[in-house]
Amino acid sequence: TYAAGPLTAQAYYHQFKRAVGTDAVSDKQMGLGAGYNFGMFRIAGSYNVADPDGANNKHTGYNLGVGVKLGAGELLGQVIQQKVSTGGTDPKATTFGIAYTQPLSKRTNVYATYGQTRNNSTGAFSLRASDITIAPVVAGDDPKAFSVGLRHMF
């Protein structure tokens, strides 16, 4: 992790073995991310790859997010693209999210969010809304979620 003033950057690489039956397989994960805070707005992006052992299962993802200050609150937006390389018709999805958060005090805020994952015909990527995962019923479904809430940090 690197942080200097308004600039942040991160990189990671993991390689680990997991036991499957009697054979140990090796999985790899890697990613890069960066962000910049311009004061009234901020932008961040990342690129991630997960390559589990075996053929035709490499997962890649791109993420771009923005935050814009609106008075004391903040409007947030995010776009994520995901793909699994299967050697056939690759499952793909684009997820869009928008949120607004408004502080009520130093430790309490209210928020509203909307998100949608758009899967291609073979995609079955889920949508995560807060701590809930909304999975598509069948490949090609497009899960959606809207939430409002009050958050207090202890």
Give the location of each predicted region.
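Detector for outer-membrane/organellar transmembrane beta-barrel domains
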Residues: 1-103, 113-117
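Outer-membrane beta-barrel and related beta-rich outer-membrane complex signature
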Residues: 23, 57, 122-130
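Extracytoplasmic loops and strand-loop junctions of Gram-negative outer membrane beta-barrel proteins
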Residues: 82, 130-134
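Short loop/turn motifs that connect adjacent beta-strands in outer-membrane beta-barrel proteins
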Residues: 104-110, 140
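Outer-membrane beta-barrel "beta-signal"
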Residues: 141-154
